[in-house]
């Protein structure tokens, strides 16, 4: 297992929160980050990070 984190950017503009994420590799971590974004409408963007390095980011599609 590798340790990643998700930086959760709120749609309301509230200060982002960091949430730990354990995944087998970056591929699994990306899939879990996408799923996390889809689970709630609270977030406008989720960054996938390893340590201080941003690996990827996913934004919510706006209608």
Regions found by a protein language model. Name each.
Residues 39-63:
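Short, mixed-charge low-complexity intrinsically disordered segments
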Residues 13, 28, 53-55:
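Generic "edge-of-domain/loop-turn" microfeature
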Residues 14, 27, 61-63:
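Short, charged/polar surface micro-motifs in flexible loops or helix N-caps
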Residues 16, 31, 56-58:
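Short acidic, gly/pro-rich beta-turn/loop elements at beta-sheet edges
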Residues 1-16:
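Short aromatic-glycine-(Arg/Gly/Cys) micro-motifs in beta-strand/loop hairpins
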Residues 10, 25, 49:
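Short, acidic, Ser/Thr-enriched surface-loop or helix-capping motifs
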Residues 14-24:
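A short, exposed loop/beta-hairpin motif centered on an aromatic-Gly-Thr core
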Residues 24-42:
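A short, charged, amphipathic alpha-helix used as a generic interaction element across diverse proteins
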């Amino acid at each position: 297992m590798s340790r990643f984190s998700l930086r959760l950017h709120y749609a309301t503009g509230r200060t982002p929160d960091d949430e730990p994420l354990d995944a087998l590799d970056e591929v699994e971590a990306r899939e879990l980050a996408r799923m996390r974004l889809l689970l709630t409408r609270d977030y406008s963007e989720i960054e996938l990070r390893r340590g201080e390095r941003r690996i990827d980011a996913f934004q919510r599609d706006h209608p």
